[in-house]
Each structure stands twice: as C-alpha cells, then as structure tokens.
Amino acid sequence: MKTTCLFISLILIQGIKTLPILEIASNNQPQNVDSVCSGTLQKTEDVHLMGFTLSGQKVADSPLEASKRWAFRTGVPPKNVEYTEGEEAKTCYNISVTDPSGKSLLLDPPTNIRDYPKCKTIHHIQGQNPHAQGIALHLWGAFFLYDRIASTTMYRGRVFTEGNIAAMIVNKTVHKMIFSRQGQGYRHMNLTSTNKYWTSNNGTQTNDTGCFGALQEYNSTKNQTCAPSKIPSPLPTARPEIKPTSTPTDATTLNTTDPNNDDEDLITSGSGSGEQEPYTTSDAVTKQGLSSTMPPTPSPQPSTPQQEGNNTDHSQGTVTEPNKTNTTAQPSMPPHNTTAISTNNTSKNNFSTLSVSLQNTTNYDTQSTATENEQTSAPSKTTLPPTGNLTTAKSTNNTKGPTTTAPNMTNGHLTSPSPTPNPTTQHLVYFRKKRSILWREGDMFPFLDGLINAPIDFDPVPNTKTIFDESSSSGASAEEDQHASPNISLTLSYFPNINENTAYSGENENDCDAELRIWSVQEDDLAAGLSWIPFFGPGIEGLYTAGLIKNQNNLVCRLRRLANQTAKSLELLLRVTTEERTFSLINRHAIDFLLTRWGGTCKVLGPDCCIGIEDLSRNISEQIDQIKKDEQKEGTGWGLGGKWWTSDWGVLTNLGILLLLSIAVLIALSCICRIFTKYIG
C-alpha cells in the first residue's frame, strides 16, 4: 500500500513538472557521416552532418518551389521530389566537395571575408527527427543555401523554396557536447549564437558563446538560461540518439507568426504535448576568428551581445544577462509576466552599432549553477539602451516587465557597470588619413548596404594609391586582435602634386587685395598719360604705372585663386565619383558571385543592361595638374604675344631696324645736303 501511494505521488509530482522535450539515449560508439548521396566526394574530418525534419509543401511543383536538394554541384538544378510532412530532410553536403580528379565542385568564397559562410540565430523547426525534435541548432554550424552561401533564416510554416535545406554542419565535439547529456531538454536556450567560431591563441582556447558551460533543463514553468562557465563539465564520448517523447504536433496549430514574413529571427515551436512554449533568443555581434579545426574542450567567456533587429515573434520571452557580482544564472520570470526585448531597427542603413559589454569580475573557478529555488527567488534584469541612441529598444507587450538598469555611456557605447575592460568588446577604429570603413563579422560583404558601422574620419593624403588594407583594430592588444574583425580601409588617390606657393599664388584669402575694382575712363586716361604729360612731363608717369602694376598683380592673384578653387572643387567631385565607382564595382562583383551559377549579371539581365563604368579619374587628375601648373607659371618679358615681329625679340628687332633706318636716313640727308651745298656754292 505504501509502495502504491508512493508510486502515485511520484506520478503526480512528475505530472506537475513538465517532462523535457527530448529524451537522449547514448550509444556506445560515435558514428560519423562516412558517405554522401552521389558521386565521388570527399568528407571533411572536422564536420558532422545532421539532418532535420521540416514542415512545408508536400509536393514540389517547380524548381523554384522544390523542398529538397540532393546534389550541391555548381550548375546542377534542384531535383523535383515529393515531400511528405514529417519526412526526415537529410541532405548530403560537406564543406569539401571535389570530383575524382581533385577539382572542387563548389564556388570559392569571396575574398576579404573571414569565417565564411555565416549563420545568424537559433531557429526552431517543426516535426520529428532522430537527432532533435523541433530544434535546429546552428551554433558553430551553418545552414547552407545554394553553393556555399549561408542562409541566415530558417522559415516556419512556410513553403520551402529552392535551396532552403535543413542540414547543419557542426564540429563533432560540439555535436557530442550538445547531445550527450541524458535527461535534459535543450529547446529553450538563451544562447548568443551569432558568428560563433573557435579560435586558438597560443594554445589558449576561447570562445564567445558565454552560455554553453552549464545548460539548464527546460521546464514549462521556468524559462531557465545558462550561465557562462570557463571549465565545462567532462563530456562523454558516446554519440546520442534522441527519441521523441510524444507524438508530433500539428504544424497548423503551431504557426502563430505572419506567413508573409520570411525574415523571422524568433520562432515559436510547440513541446511534445502540443502546447506552445514562448522563448526569446538574443543575437550577439562578436568579432572572432575562425580556426580550421575546432578545439575539443571549450572555455566560454562573456560575450558582447547586440540586440538584432527585425524580430517578428509576437510571443513573450526573456532576455537576461549575468551580473558583475553574481555569475550564476539569472532566471526569467514566468511566461505570463515576461517581456521580450526587440530592437526597433528595421532599416539596414544604420550607421550606429549598439555595443554592450558584459564583464564578470568574480573568479571563474568559483562559478556554480544556482539551484532551482535560488533561481526562482532571484530577480531577472534586462538591459535597455537609452532612447537617445539611434538603435532603440522597446517592449513587445504592455505587461509589466522585469527591473531595468540603465547602462553607462562610454565613448558612445553602451556598457554594463564593469571596472575592467572586456577583451571581446567591439572597437571602433579611426584611420587617420584614410577612409575607414568597418564591417561587422558575419556580414555577407563589407560594402553592401547598411554595413558601415563606424564614424568616418576622412583626411586624404596627397599622392596615395588605391589599396585595400586588411588590418586589425589599431591600438588593440594582441589578444583583442584575435577576436577583432578585419577593418577594410579604402585609400584612394585624390590629390596630385602641389608645388610650393609663390607670391600672389591665391592659396590663402589674404594673398589678394580685397579692394579690386575696374578703372574708369578718366583713370585710364591718367594711366596712359594723355592728360598730365603736357603739364608735368613724362617723369610723373611712374606713379601711375606702379598703381597699374599693383592692380594687374591683384588680377593675377584673383585668377590663381579662382583656378585653385576650381581645382579643389574638381578634386572633390573626383573623390565622390571614384568612391562611387569603387562601391559600384564591389557590389557588381558580389552580384556576379551570387549569380555565377546562372552565368553572371550580364547573362541574367541581358547585354543591354550589362554596362561598365569607365574610369576617367586619370584624365581629370591630369587636367587638375595642368590648371595648377598654368596658374603657378611665372611669365617673363613683356609678353605682348602675336607674330614674331610683335614678340619679345621681335619688338627689339623692330626697334633696331627702325634705329638703323633712322641712322641711314640721317646719313643720307647729310650726304644730300653736302652735295647740294657743293653744287650751289
């Protein structure tokens, strides 16, 4: 009788506490993906392929609506296949795919882009799968779209278009770390999952997840999160096999979002019992390098989260962050009294970056996970950016949210109260005498729209060349450089050589007399000496000649100033046109890369729309140089111009000839007079 009562009590207690979504059963030996669908393809030893089940269209009617792709080869169209809801959507794809001769069948990633391809957030999908029911983790992994192009969004309750697949490539160690713990469900994890890759700095293993050391068990009454831990618990080597605990839920009853919205960052998925469970994920913008092989033992550090925009989930969730004096996990409020914080940032052309640095000042070795009672009694805190920032945050519901703390403002960045700097804090770098353009790691291309995240300190340098300089953050330490994204600085050649200033060069406003005016008719007569020579003689002409020369010099100075201003204006126009041409070419190369399998931009748009931008910057620079040479050229002589007899030497020659003719006439007259006198006398 006592045993029966105890058994009934256990059943009742177990009924109160919701069962985990997943039951994980480990096998003895891990199993790897040793083969692919077709062809002679090579397998990368560092990856593990995971398949997921998607809910979508059951029959593909056209290539653009195909729900599966079997071969990921360049130029191979997708195969039209029937798709049954609940079917396991496995796709054979590895990072390294070559033909028997060793030639790669995939497109090469674009240059100047690190850690390619990229992912964005954690997303949920519906259905059953031997690995994970209702969850698609691409932490340290990538959903692939087309040929090595990363798909940033998985859709829920939508028809899957051509190329949208449900396969993830992750590190095998990470795979075992995720799926080797029994009795824990990982559907709700407040993970900062943007651009998480491993790096090694002289043997020191680091990452920026900040949330994989102590994963909490998911419960319907408490949306628990995980606290960062430097030394994770030992992981078993067995490969897990996940079994669903209940029947699959109906996809139509779980679809609560707008069906017309394809860019969903927050997606609600149901539990095994068919009820909806809200959750919220927080994306983080981190700057970290990619190691070719991921370390087997992670050591998480606090990350630098950033609230991503375009959050379209209408459910409720929580966003938590660790306190600087308490490194244990901060539990969230119950689902009926929670607040989901979304960033109101619908414009992609946002030139401000919300950077929040989280720093734990206590020792990592003393960190421990709080118990369930301690978590329920601890308050939950959320950090809200101030309203003055360009990127604003607001609550998605009108319920009373948790306690908010205003962060400190430091150099335009939002930071939590922390006395020590964070090595993973995002730095905005100013390149003096360069056009500095910062791009965030994870963006598809550095010069696409909305990717300029830093102010511009532009001071052009004369005689510079057009270069691409890929460097780390200036002023940062070596450890920060390991996590910093490359700064693509574009230095363009704008200004030609400029000689030293001469007298009346017009370079400065004070070079020329401001009292420049046009002479009247009387003043012209005075300058010509027509009115005063008969009275005062030609000696007084020098006074008026000096005034005439001064006025002429002012005219020359004003002309030089006008030439300099014209040259500077042309230089500004050349700067703008050169920059626009550079950006246009970069965007054109990016579009050509995306449309390579269809023949490129000219093939898709047609030859009439395939135009090029002619580079005339050299011609304009030559004209600017010529203007400056002309206005700085010092003229010599009288400069009367005209034919040879009116030139400088021509005038002297003419005077000499006239003088000789005059002497000859005088001699002739003298001779004539003597002859006439002789004959008369």
Curated annotation (Swiss-Prot):
One of its GO terms (biological process) is fusion of virus membrane with host endosome membrane. The record marks 435-436 as: Cleavage. Keywords: Cleavage on pair of basic residues, Disulfide bond, Fusion of virus membrane with host endosomal membrane, Fusion of virus membrane with host membrane, Glycoprotein, Host cell membrane, Host membrane, Host-virus interaction, Lipoprotein, Membrane, Palmitate, Signal, Transmembrane, Transmembrane helix, Viral attachment to host cell, Viral envelope protein, Viral penetration into host cytoplasm, Virion, Virus entry into host cell. One of its GO terms (cellular component) is virion membrane. Residues 529-549 are annotated as: Fusion peptide. Residues 277-455 are annotated as: Mucin-like region. Glycans are attached at residues 94, 171, 190, 202, 207, 219, 223, 255, 310, 323, 326, 337, 344-345, 350, 360, 389, 397, 408, 487, 564, 619. Residues 670-681 are cytoplasmic. It holds the Pfam family Ebola-like_HR1-HR2. Residues 1-18 form the signal peptide. InterPro entries: Ebola-like_HR1-HR2 (IPR054584), GPC_FiloV (IPR014625), GPC_filovir-type_extra_dom (IPR002561), TLV/ENV_coat_polyprotein (IPR018154). Homotrimer; each monomer consists of a GP1 and a GP2 subunit linked by disulfide bonds. The resulting peplomers (GP1,2) protrude from the virus surface as spikes. GP1,2 interacts with human CD209 and CLEC4M (collectively referred to as DC-SIGN(R)). Asialoglycoprotein receptor (ASGP-R) may be a liver-specific receptor for GP1,2. Members of the Tyro3 receptor tyrosine kinase family may be cell entry factors interacting with GP1,2. GP1 is responsible for binding to the receptor(s) on target cells. Interacts with CD209/DC-SIGN and CLEC4M/DC-SIGNR which act as cofactors for virus entry into the host cell. Binding to CD209 and CLEC4M, which are respectively found on dendritic cells (DCs), and on endothelial cells of liver sinusoids and lymph node sinuses, facilitate infection of macrophages and endothelial cells. These interactions not only facilitate virus cell entry, but also allow capture of viral particles by DCs and subsequent transmission to susceptible cells without DCs infection (trans infection). GP2 acts as a class I viral fusion protein. Under the current model, the protein has at least 3 conformational states: pre-fusion native state, pre-hairpin intermediate state, and post-fusion hairpin state. During viral and target cell membrane fusion, the coiled coil regions (heptad repeats) assume a trimer-of-hairpins structure, positioning the fusion peptide in close proximity to the C-terminal region of the ectodomain. The formation of this structure appears to drive apposition and subsequent fusion of viral and target cell membranes. Belongs to the filoviruses glycoprotein family. The coiled coil regions play a role in oligomerization and fusion activity. This is Envelope glycoprotein. It comes from Lake Victoria marburgvirus (strain Popp-67).
